[in-house]
């Protein structure tokens, strides 16, 4: 997001609460009008950066935004919730760059706001909550997420653990809304966190997913399967030690009455074959025994993935690994964007 060409000025100790309140009211008005929405976001960024080094003022901003968003209707909440992620936005230019660690003290109150929004909102706002969460992860985690040799500072690890804790707490909570949002957010965390953190916490995340998949009354398994796919795609061949147990957990979903779950289970198997083929291919006859019925599944998307897996088995392995890898990620991107079951 553009913040203009002016250099950001940091004022210490910051603006008065009355000045902040007046600015926020003007910003809310602009955000709720499409023609001035981006202007409102830019003004909010400048407001945050003016008060960034004044914790009491920053907490006042967070509390005011939280109290403003909570009573809004879902359609009104959507554009305003982006303010919660903009709190952590650092300009990309070297001239205006801000050390991401300065944002860490504000992570806890913002996550508390998201937690309250789960309780006070209906399901239409859940994707927005997860998208805001993803933007927060992107804004405060190291930008080079593919680097496996970077050393994270303790503050960065603590911030990650706080966000991971938010996800797992909601996934284990005895309410469908929390479970859905927790699973959606964990998917975003896995997709946007540095590789070094994926390696460190993969076993913990995998165990959480496996334990919840086992629970018959866990009513967010569509989101959970999506999360599992993202975990495998992020880990790639490092997922090998977990391949066998994962396979046996998802095979039961191939007989599920929900076609979306059947399709996602097939996607998990397809991803496992690609990244952990030495573990999975010896079990192909066992897997095929589950796939036979799906060759004539009434849902086209299910049949297509089933036939693709059978084709891979018949060839024993992908002919062109690099091309298959690109196609694999493209297929899952389109599949996961399919209409979700309500």
Regions found by a protein language model. Name each.
Residues 12, 47-57, 87-106, 123, ...:
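Flexible helix-coil junctions and inter-repeat linker/turn elements that act as hinges
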Residues 60-63, 68, 73, 123:
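N-terminal interaction modules that seed assembly of large macromolecular complexes
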Residues 27, 43-50, 65-69, 80-94, ...:
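Hydrophobic residues within the alpha-helices of tandem HEAT/HEAT-like
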Residues 32-33, 72-73, 121-122, 174-175, ...:
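Short inter-helical turns and helix N-cap capping residues of alpha-solenoid HEAT/ARM repeat scaffolds
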Residues 5, 9-28, 37-40, 54-66, ...:
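Core helices of alpha-solenoid repeat scaffolds
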Residues 261, 268-272, 276-290:
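Juxtamembrane loop segments immediately following a transmembrane helix
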Residues 2-22, 35, 39, 286-342:
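Eukaryotic acidic, Ser/Thr-rich intrinsically disordered low-complexity regions
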């Amino acid at each position: 997001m553009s913040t203009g060409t002016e250099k950001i000025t940091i004022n210490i100790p910051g603006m008065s609460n009355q000045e902040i309140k007046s600015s926020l009211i003007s910003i809310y008005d602009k955000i709720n009008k499409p023609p001035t929405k981006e202007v409102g976001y830019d003004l909010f960024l400048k407001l945050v950066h003016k008060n960034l080094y004044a914790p009491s003022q920053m907490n006042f901003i967070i509390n005011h935004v939280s109290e403003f968003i909570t009573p809004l209707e879902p359609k009104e909440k959507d554009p305003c919730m982006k303010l919660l992620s903009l709190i952590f936005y650092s300009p990309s230019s070297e001239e205006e760059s801000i050390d991401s660690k300065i944002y860490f003290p504000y992570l806890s109150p913002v996550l508390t706001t998201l937690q309250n929004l789960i309780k006070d909102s209906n399901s239409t706002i859940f994707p927005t909550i997860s998208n805001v969460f993803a933007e927060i992860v992107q804004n405060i985690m190291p930008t080079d997420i593919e680097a496996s040799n970077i050393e994270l500072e303790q503050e960065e690890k603590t911030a990650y653990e706080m966000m991971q804790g938010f996800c797992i707490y909601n996934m284990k909570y005895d309410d469908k809304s929390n479970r859905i949002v927790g699973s959606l957010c964990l998917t975003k965390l896995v997709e946007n966190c540095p590789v070094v953190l994926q390696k460190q916490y993969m076993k913990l995340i995998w165990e959480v997913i496996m334990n919840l998949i086992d629970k018959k009354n866990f009513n967010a398994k569509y989101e959970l399967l999506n999360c599992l796919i993202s975990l495998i795609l992020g880990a790639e061949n490092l997922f090998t030690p977990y391949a066998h147990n994962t396979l046996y957990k998802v095979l039961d979903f191939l007989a599920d009455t929900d076609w979306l779950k059947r399709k996602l289970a097939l996607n998990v198997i397809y991803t496992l074959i690609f990244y952990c083929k030495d573990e999975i291919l010896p079990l192909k006859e066992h897997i095929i025994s589950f796939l036979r019925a799906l060759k004539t599944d009434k849902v086209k998307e299910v049949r297509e993935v089933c036939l693709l897996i059978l084709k891979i088995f018949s060839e024993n392995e992908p002919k062109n690994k690099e091309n298959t890898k690109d196609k694999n990620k493209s297929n899952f991107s389109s599949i996961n964007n399919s209409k979700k079951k309500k």
